[in-house]
Structure formats: C-alpha cells, structure tokens
Amino acid sequence: MSSAPRRPAKGADSFCTPEPESLGPGTPGFPEQEEDELHRTLGVERFEEILQEAGSRGGEEPGRSYGEEDFEYHRQSSHHIHHPLSTHLPPDARRRKTPQGPGRKPRRRPGASPTGETPTIEEGEEDEDEASEAEGARALTQPSPVSTPSSVQFFLQEDDSADRKAERTSPSSPAPLPHQEATPRASKGAQAGTQVEEAEAVAVASGTAGGDDGGASGRPLPKAQPGHRSYNLQERRRIGSMTGAEQALLPRVPTDEIEAQTLATADLDLMKSHRFEDVPGVRRHLVRKNAKGSTQSGREGREPGPTPRARPRAPHKPHEVFVELNELLLDKNQEPQWRETARWIKFEEDVEEETERWGKPHVASLSFRSLLELRRTLAHGAVLLDLDQQTLPGVAHQVVEQMVISDQIKAEDRANVLRALLLKHSHPSDEKDFSFPRNISAGSLGSLLGHHHGQGAESDPHVTEPLIGGVPETRLEVERERELPPPAPPAGITRSKSKHELKLLEKIPENAEATVVLVGCVEFLSRPTMAFVRLREAVELDAVLEVPVPVRFLFLLLGPSSANMDYHEIGRSISTLMSDKQFHEAAYLADEREDLLTAINAFLDCSVVLPPSEVQGEELLRSVAHFQRQMLKKREEQGRLLPTGAGLEPKSAQDKALLQMVEAAGAAEDDPLRRTGRPFGGLIRDVRRRYPHYLSDFRDALDPQCLAAVIFIYFAALSPAITFGGLLGEKTQDLIGVSELIMSTALQGVVFCLLGAQPLLVIGFSGPLLVFEEAFFSFCSSNHLEYLVGRVWIGFWLVLLALLMVALEGSFLVRFVSRFTQEIFAFLISLIFIYETFYKLVKIFQEHPLHGCSASNSSEVDGGENMTWAVARPTLGPGNRSLAGQSGQGKPRGQPNTALLSLVLMAGTFFIAFFLRKFKNSRFFPGRIRRVIGDFGVPIAILIMVLVDYSIEDTYTQKLSVPSGFSVTAPEKRGWVINPLGEKSPFPVWMMVASLLPAILVFILIFMETQITTLIISKKERMLQKGSGFHLDLLLIVAMGGICALFGLPWLAAATVRSVTHANALTVMSKAVAPGDKPKIQEVKEQRVTGLLVALLVGLSIVIGDLLRQIPLAVLFGIFLYMGVTSLNGIQFYERLHLLLMPPKHHPDVTYVKKVRTLRMHLFTALQLLCLALLWAVMSTAASLAFPFILILTVPLRMVVLTRIFTDREMKCLDANEAEPVFDEREGVDEYNEMPMPV
C-alpha cells in the first residue's frame, strides 16, 4: 500500500477523535491531517494488532475434525478474501479485551514463520482462529453502557464522519467529506431496497436516515443495525469490478472508498487479483492432522449469539422425489408468470395445452441433444450445494449473486433476473377451484392487502414494487428478510387443501422432497444462464408448488430466444433425471459438480436412442422395452459389483451394518417346507412359528376393512356352497346336499380358523372333490355298497394317512408338483364343469321337449300330463318343497317352455356374472364402486335370475332341494350319524380294508389343493409377516374331513380362488403410488376373526331355507359354467392351445414364445394334451375313481421323461411358475390369472 513510515497504533488512540478546541487557525491543513490519520489507521502494525486482538478473544474448541468442505472454504475465504480495513473496533468495544483463560497457552501465530516457508497449520489452531474472529465480531454487537445505538459505527468512513461532525462545531471547519450514516430500521415492512441514483433523490420510505452527501452517487445505502454485526465470508465473495469507488454496486466493498481513491489503477488491479482471484496451488498451507481426541466441533458448543455459527453437515439421505416443471410464459393478461407444464412422481405427466388438464402418465422420451446441452450447462453454470436458505427470495438472491460472480450475467441484469425468479406461479388446478385462489403469490397478496393500509402505512417492497423493470434491489433487502421472522398470514386468509390437492398428495410418498425446475426465455439476457441448487434442508416454499411438499432442489435456466437451445426440452431432461432413482441419489450425495456430471454420464449409458425413422405401428417398438430391461439389469449388476466406487450409495458404517443385517435376515429366513429330520418336526415348527401371534390375530381384526371383507367373503363362500350342494345332491340322490355342505363348511371353518396356522385360507368344497364324490357314488351303486358307510372308512384311513405324512414331513413333496401337472388338473376340472353344464341342459330339453304352437291346446295331451302340470303348479309357491331328485309321479315331465326358460336362466346367470367380473376392471365409475360390483357379481347374478324366474308364474322350473330347519336333505334316507358297520346291511370287511385305496386318492386331491393354495398365499410378494404352516393346516383339514365322515358331511379342502380373494380383501394397498405405477402392498390384516365370522354366517344360512328353495337349478348350472370358463384364465396350457391355430407372426411377446422354438413349444403342448385326453378317458370309464392316481403320475412323467426331451432352458421357460399376485385393475386380469388351479 503506502511506503511512508507509520507509528504503531496503541489501544484506542488510533480511533480517537481530535478535540474541537485544538483545531485553531494554526492547525495544519486537513489534507495533511487526513493523510496522517490514514497512515496510522492503515499501518501494518495496526493491522497486526487487530489480528492479535481478535485472536485473543477465544475460539473454537480444539479437536474439531475438518473435511474437504472446510479446507475448500478456508482456501476460498480466509486466504483470498480479506476483511475490509474499515472494520475496526469502536473505541469502547476495543478496550474490552477478553483475558486469556488459566488453561489457555500462548501460541505462535502461523503466519510468523521465521524460515519464510509456507507454515503448517494445525487443525486446532485453525479452529481457534475462526472462533477468535467470530467472538471478536460478537463483541461488536454489545454496545457499551455509555454509548447510544447511534454512536456505534462499523466502517472507517463512519469514523471519519464522526470526526467531521466534531470539526463542524468549529467556525473554521471546512465542508465535510462525503459520508453515509446508518440508523436502525424502523419496522419489518420498511422500504430498504432503493438504490440511489443521485444524492438529492435519496428516498427515506421506511425511516432509514440517509445522508445528504453529494459525492456518493450510485452507491446504495450501507446496512447497519444497532448493536448487531455479523460476518459471513461466503456472502462477501465479489468480482473485481465491484471494488471501484465509481462503479461500486454493493454496499460493503472489501476496500475503503478513501483508500481506493488514493491508490493508482495498477494498485487496485493488483489488490483485486490478490483478494478475489483463486489461483490453484498458491498460498495454500499444509494441513496436518491433529491428534486430539475430541471430535466435537467447537462451533457446536458456542452460546447463541448474533454471529451465525456453522451448522453440522447437511443430511444427504436420499428421499422420494416429486418434480415440477415450470416455464416462463405469458398469461391471458400478457403478464409473465411461471406456469406448470409437467410433473414427475415416477412417470411424466404433461398438461394438455387446449384443455388445461393432465394427460396420462408415460415414460419420458428425451432428445439426445437436450441431454448433451444439459450436461454442458451443468459443466459451466452455477452449482450451489447445501445452500442454507429458508425462503424463495433468499435462494433467488444467492443464485443471482453466484451468477454474477461466475460471469454468467452482467451486474446490471441482477435485478431483472431476481424479479423473474420471484414471479407468480400458476398451476392447472388453480382454475378448477371456484373458491378463493389457493396459491397466493407475493404480488397478488400485496395488491390484495394494499387496500387495507392507510396512506401513511409502510409497505413491503416485495409486494408493492413491479416485478420486472422496476428499481433494482440490493443485498440489504434480502438480508433483512432473512434475519427477520417470516410474516404471519393475514387474518381471514387461510390455505385450505382442495380435493385435487388431497388426491395428488395421496400419490406422493410421505417423506418425498420436491425439485423445482424453472426454465424460460427472457430477452434482457445476452446468453443463457443456469443454476443448480441443493438446499441444506428441505423447506416449503409458499406458492411455488402445486402441493405443499418441501423443496430440496432447484434448477434454473434462463436465456434469450435467439440462443440455439430448447429450454423446454432441457427442463424435461433435468426433470426426468431427477425422477430417476440413481441420478437423484447421486444428486443427494454429490459433493461437487463432477459428481453430477458423472451421474449424467451413467444415465446416458443406460439410455436408449431410437433412430429418426418413421414408426408405422406400436408393434414395431416391442423390442424397446425388452432392450431397456436388459440395460437396467446390467445397471443393477454394476451397482452391486461397485457399490462404493459409483458414489451413489451412502458409505456410512451405520448404513453398511444395516445392509448386512438385512442380507443376514434374508439368508436365515425360515423355510416352512424345510425338513428337520425328526418325527413331527415340521408340525412343531409350525406351532412355534404361528401360535405366538395368536392374540394379535384377534387384535388386528379391529379394522373397518375386516368388516367389509366379512360381508364380501360370506357371499363368496355361500354361493359355491349352494351351487356345489345342489349339484352334489343331483349326483348322490340327495344323500349329501345343500344342508350337509353348509353345515360342513361352517363347522370345519370355525375349527380351522381357531386352530389353523394360516387363517387366510378359506376351506370349502371344490370341483375335484365333486368329481370324486360322483365317481365313488357310481362305484358303490354298481357294487351294491352303502355310499355313506364307505365314506366313513375312507375318513378313518384319511386320518392315518395325514398323521403318517405329517410325521414324515412329507409336505415338501408339493414342490415337485410343477405347473405342468397343475395346469392339466385345472384344465380337466374346467372341462368337466363346462361339460356337466351342457349335459344337464340337454337332459332338461329331453325331459321337457319343445311343443308346437297347437300342441299345448290340443286334446291329444293325455290326462297324465295334465295331472303332472297340476302337480307342478303348487311347486311355484314359496312354502312347497322342490321335487328335484324325486322319482315317479311326483316329478313333472314334458312341461311347456321349461327348457327354454332353463336355457334363459342358465345363460343369463353366466353372462351377468361374467360381465360383472369384466366390469370390475373397466373404466366406468370410480374404482371403489367397480370393485364392489365385481366382487359381488355371482350373488347379484343369482338374485336377478331368481327374480326373473319368480316373476314368470306360468312356467315350471326345477328348484333347489333344501329342507326346512336343521335337517338333512333327505331325512327318509339317512340321519345325522352314520353307523360305520352299516346302515341297512353289514358293511363288508374287505371293503373296510380296501377303502385305503380311495382314501389315498382323496388324500392326493386334498393334499394338492391345500398345499398349492398355501404356497400361493405365502408368496413373498404378498408380504405376510406371521408365516404359514403347511403341516399343521394339512393335518387339521384332513383330520376334520375324516371325523365329519361319521356325520355324513362332505370332505373339504382349501379353496384356491376363495382363499386368494380373502387375502386380497384384507390387503391394504399403499395410496402413495405414482400414477402409472403398479400398486404396492402396505400391509395385510392377518387375523382369524373374518374367517370365523364367515363360517358362522354360512352356518346360520340354513335358516333361510325358504329363500334358497326359490333358486332354480338352471341358475346353478349358469354358475357352474361361469366357474368352468373363468378357471381357464391364467392357464398357460390354454393359451398355448390358441397358438396352435395362430401364425407365428401373431404370437405374443412372452418368454415361452421368444426363448423356445415354435415346434418345440407345440410338442410340449401336445404332450400336455395327450395327458389330458388320458385322464378324460379314465373318467369316462368304470375306473373313474382312479383319476387322482393317473393325475399324480404326471409328476414323475415331467421329472423323468420331459427332462430327456427338452433342455433345461426350455423347461424353465415352458414350466416356470411366473404367476404373481394381481392387485392392479388391468382389463381382463384378476385373481384367476394368478393360479393354475381348479375352482
């Protein structure tokens, strides 16, 4: 600076003001006096004393550990950005020096290295230096008791101003030098952002007293608060062009104006280069790790004060993301505003320009050029990571300052860019609400409240000044807003969430953090400017987002329209990147710009580029999805191989430990089918696994969803009980009918729900058991054996077989029952259902043939027919029993229109139930109404067709046979207890032993249905928490069936469709599902109460016998047909039969088509078809009882024969179990698509 000799300043003498009486005529001129004062003030000794004095005021606690951010901060601020020489202590505050504590040791200043080398800085010393500066600044905030707030000055020119005021008391004092005096602000709404163009035009709108100087033209008012002074070195960063006295744009320049005027231009340039340019590798001190034990930062332990202390490192844990793209457009009044044009929760949703409504979610398609432009702008734009701001104006001010510093925009464009950032935000949902506008911008709120203030009231410059083209704002305005608490909302204005907002909030995850993307064209800029901001903490920015979600990231891109850049596409690109899981995790964990660029490169590596050719149809793009899946799979594999090198995952020890715990838990997962090698070991493990949750099985039922599930499952269980009961009565001549099946379902259901390991299973009668009952009844009738007595001995053998299977832990055998066997079984039962339906219908047409038009009135009709018609008429009354199953003269024959009405009832029931099931996944009505209608489709179809039949009084139809009260179906044939030794004649002893063979066959059916159903319910995708018990459930179901045979009740098994429906009804889906994404399971209400109540309600249904007697058998045939047709859904064998008649070019894009040659696929289908034909042939002969044995032979056939014909790769494609739980509402997809099992 100056080479003149200087006297070291002593104490407060360097700040003393000369006495007025000492200024006489003989006093030397003021220029010489000012130069002497300036030399004494700017002396090196004085500067060194200030540093020593500041360093003696305490510091941070030793032992603080530094990171790379601290070192970068130290290099950028402490060594290259110096404090202004005008920031001296006032006289009173300077006298109070903090004495050194008793434990404080004197230390050598690091800059006083005697050797002239670059000294090495201890970390503890660096902390103490920073703390000393901070406490020195805190001392400034405490005025002395004898001083008034207005007597505290902070700048050198203010000290000179005080000297000039004292000199003005002398008559001979000349005109004072230009100065500025700062006084405290009057109120929160003060006008503080006005830049002075002329000294005479200074406006004091908020009580801030400005000077009347004439030489300070072009400089803003300096900010000063009484008793308050704090330094933030990061905010003091400036470019060199701001330091000139004539071109100063900021109030606190790093050099004094007097000093700047005295120095030459070369000296000023040297000063700018020294203070503001960051030359890599120059004057960087070596940092040696300090071996102190304490790891707590000294900043944490300071007492609160006006000096902002450094906060701990910002949490970088990735959150779910919500991205909103806002573009700078003109509204209908031709005023600029930020308008939302797209949003991302997981997929992109665009606003349709014409209708102003949201389009369908879709995968964002980006142009490759926009991605490259985005990477280039990120490489050269402003990147602010962990910005500590809480309001949009504060963030905007920091962004604009960083743009000026990085020379992206000119200094004169600062105000325009700032005003552009603070424009109003509008959303498509704003116009849908007819109430008070939901999003209130700063400008509209100011205009709204302006009518309630008087003329003398002070106004906030944020809401009264125009947004574009007004007076530029200064740092004073934004800092004042940051320091003062946020204003309270005005009375009478409340922010209520609209219906649209609440619906959108349900789709957004609870802990999501938002990203705001602002892009647009502004003509006042000469080139594009960009800023990427990551806030230190997520904050809610008022009137910015469509929904109140805290904002963590902001991206800004402004530029002229003349630039060769598509701002909209670049905004879509960064929005899509932020919605990508890997990239937004990298954005959370990024420490510098290079991390973001690396994440963009990783995104480009997994992106798919389509050639610029015309696509004639969507089928041409089928390979894109497959190729993208391969790229994502490769990306996941690379992430698993290099989790730490990629920098995309947290590296903390806690996260690593948590990951290891999860992996260990997955590896040690308890497999319920794993054998223990001990007798009944699996049963004991099932009891130990499931019974500790017994009490919670009742507590978890206290939920409204469980009550709704009870009503739904009741009808789902009652309809098959009535249907199969009526058909079973037809097959067994009413030895077992509706009453027996209802009682069996109720009793076994209650016991199973109280003792079973998986209470979500619904046990009931099924098609395979119906086929076996018919076959065994035919066998007993042909051999003159008592059917019910034979069932008793089969029941005894069933119990022994179940005990033997559980003791040997044989439930693991269910793993060998592959899709090959399951599909053959399910297809066979579906064919039987369909065949039986039309067989019964043909039989009705044979018993009641169609007559000609004159036949009904002719006299050729004999008296027997007239008498049967007369007998048939009373059956239409509600109090008469149905004559179904009776022989002789009691059963009417040859009735007119009976066959046609039966056909109408059967077809009507089938089509109503079938289309109501389709309606469940249609697009009509809200989803909740559709699900209710679809779930109750079968009861609704039965009710409608019963009313149709009841309304036609002139036509006879055969009704369901149901007894009155608690009675068996045919009391004249049997009772409730069956004698094992024989009812009418002694039962043969050889048959008691031979009953083992049919018992094995029944056990095969029950084992397959129960265990496969348990496997389907227990899939990992269903997220069950309490586990299942294969051995315990099998033992209970088979043992109860054996005991129920003593009472003439039918055997039951786990009904697959009803069990899956029960589990789905108790599944709670997460509402935070992105539009277009698959629904996710939140929890499953695993409890016993719903199954228990359903079983009791089914048992009580026996009292509605009068209502059940009104159901025609033709309606049950329609339900039978419905179950047969719907069971074909999800059977891959049925789909491959279609491919036999389809050209290869029309084959679907599935695994077994793409990975297996067409001829080999057709060969596999032919083998399944051959096995199905063999089973059908067996069931059509007298050996139909052995069909379960033929079915189980398909298991070794698949394991031995097919593995020699097909390769392992082909078998994995053709025989893989790819069925997953179905929860979404895709058309034509429901529970039947999940299981290749019969109904």
UniProtKB/Swiss-Prot annotation:
Lipid attachment (S-palmitoyl cysteine) is at 1171
Looking at the UniProt record for this protein, which Gene Ontology cellular component terms does it annotate, in alphabetical order?
apical plasma membrane; basolateral plasma membrane
Quick one: where's region Membrane (anion exchange)?
A: 706-1239, 708-1239
* Leader peptide range in chain numbering: none
Give start-end positions of Low complexity composition bias: 141-155, 189-207
What membrane topology does the annotation report for this chain?
Multi-pass membrane protein
Mark the residues carrying the PTM Phosphoserine: 113, 132, 144, 170, 172, 241, 441
**Which residue ranges traverse the bilayer?**
707-727, 752-772, 794-814, 824-844, 896-916, 932-952, 987-1007, 1034-1054, 1088-1108, 1111-1131, 1172-1192
* Residues exposed to the Cytoplasmic side: 1-706, 917-931
Modified residues annotated as Phosphothreonine in this record: 255
Query: Compositionally biased, Gly residues: which spans?
Result: 208-217
Q: Which family does it belong to?
A: Belongs to the anion exchanger (TC 2.A.31) family.
Protein name per its UniProtKB record: Anion exchange protein 2
Q: Which organism is it from?
A: Pongo abelii
State the gene name recorded for this protein: SLC4A2
